[in-house]
């Protein structure tokens, strides 16, 4: 059973419980793609822009930040596979610079100072530990809080915009619970088509968000109890990384239960090792502790065996995904 939930994980479960299982329980990691890499690089460049003095927050400097951020990470393992040649990478970079140029048509970063950036928010809602990172939090001219999220993609048409605020509503709820102040506004900045969608916040909205996330959490717990993570066929299936192993599309898809069992045992062993380390070693445990007779050498040996087994299963599934 997972111990924490983020808004993105909650949305993933709501979209398709099976996809949620593959990503978060089986821990079959989706390789970073070009769109994700671009979004991450754009986000980091915008964050670093506000490290500069206000009068230095120019478009040229923002473009240079994008180049520097990408230069620092382009040879990482998660990125080296993205491009077949320099022309592809150049076109990708030009598109990223265009997104940042669009940002300057929406805001003037020399005219304000964000209150916080890349802020961790976390809190307990009943038995749910909810956490996430918000891009930016400002105070408007009236001194009210505004939560801002950058989106490197395209804004939806107006009638579809409301569901996109789900994460920000939860962040607003956590901020209210943490500091006792209700944010006044939520803002989504879409860079691809230079659009800002905003939404006023009220207490009823936040209570509705609380009810919705708890309902999702209850459904997640039921799925764990019953070991049942059904597929939900939807319009996003064609873009899902896990489609080749999804039973909805492949009746011969590999069973990932053994992988889940491996992950659960590895987590239990790591928790035992962490508990022993926290008190400074086995010798500091009281005589009646259930961990007193723990053989750390044997535990670490078993951990190595399980991780090797897990890596073998993941490789086999990865080969299946790449077919």
Give the residues covered by each predicted segment.
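Mg2+/Mn2+-dependent nuclease catalytic core
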Residues: 112-115, 119-215
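Short, compositionally biased low-complexity segments
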Residues: 13-20, 40-41, 58-80, 181-193
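Short acidic (Asp/Glu) and glycine-rich catalytic loops that position anionic groups and cofactors
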Residues: 19-26, 43-44, 75, 148-152, ...
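A non-catalytic, helix-rich entry segment at domain boundaries
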Residues: 45-117, 279-305, 309-312, 316-322
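C-terminal, charged and often intrinsically disordered regions of DNA end-processing helicases
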Residues: 1-36, 268, 273-278, 310-323
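Short amphipathic alpha-helical segments and their helix-coil junctions
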Residues: 17-30, 77-79, 147, 153, ...
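Nuclease catalytic cores
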Residues: 11, 15-54, 93-97, 118
